[in-house]
Amino acid sequence: PNNSEKIYTYGVPILSSDDGGQTFYRIGKENVHADHHDLWINPEKPGHLINGNDGGVNITYDDGENWIKNNSTEVGQFYAINVDYQKPYNVYGGLQDNGVWMGPHNSVENKRWNMTGQYPWKGILGGDGMEIQIDNRNPNIVFTGSQFGFYARLDLDSGKRKSIKPSHELGQSPFRFNWQTPILLSPHNQDVLYLGSNFLHKSINQGDDWENISEDLTKGGKKGNVPYGTITTISESPITEGVIYVGSDDGIIHVTKNGGKTWKNIS
């Protein structure tokens, strides 16, 4: 505010100019989230900035050379959570624009975490963290992903990652995936994985191969930035294998009682 040549602009990423906007340079660092929404500039102290972003709040006193991450502000938005069967069990969560994290359920917040580096939570995927399914036979095998159906099978032990997003066949219309695409491991067989687009897809080998086991279970898509006419939830009966309920964002609920051979609209 006291220097007409000094300009800040933010969105993705955060930039600064010292020459009235003729040239810009990045001032974000590795501990600052890439998506920026607000910036406070101290009128009494040049270089003192407070930045609000998708990761929370960051503060700098030297015009972006170094940033402090303020972890005390609890602003994380979870899209989904799940747990495994370990003892003690782990909690998994997909966060809006902050990836997928996991950690022991019995961890207690400790102010020494930052000093010791012994933070109990671990990030296992980036992007917008979405739903999580864990193989109950081997908790190192985790299925999770980011927005619009970009899911992967993770081996937490080896660090290997395999993309498992279903693809349409040549000549077919592309599938429509919800922002928060649903996935489900069958409670009857942990090799069987379901994933919803506008169709219900089934894999019998943990996502290596897919088959469509339904027709389009929506009223059809609409043009726009975000897909519409998509499946949003999948549930299989824990008692009877092959009894599956599917809901979509246009208000339709379908059920199959024979593993996808026939479907009935019950909405």
Residue ranges and their predicted role:
Residues 1-267:
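Beta-propeller blade termini and top-face loops
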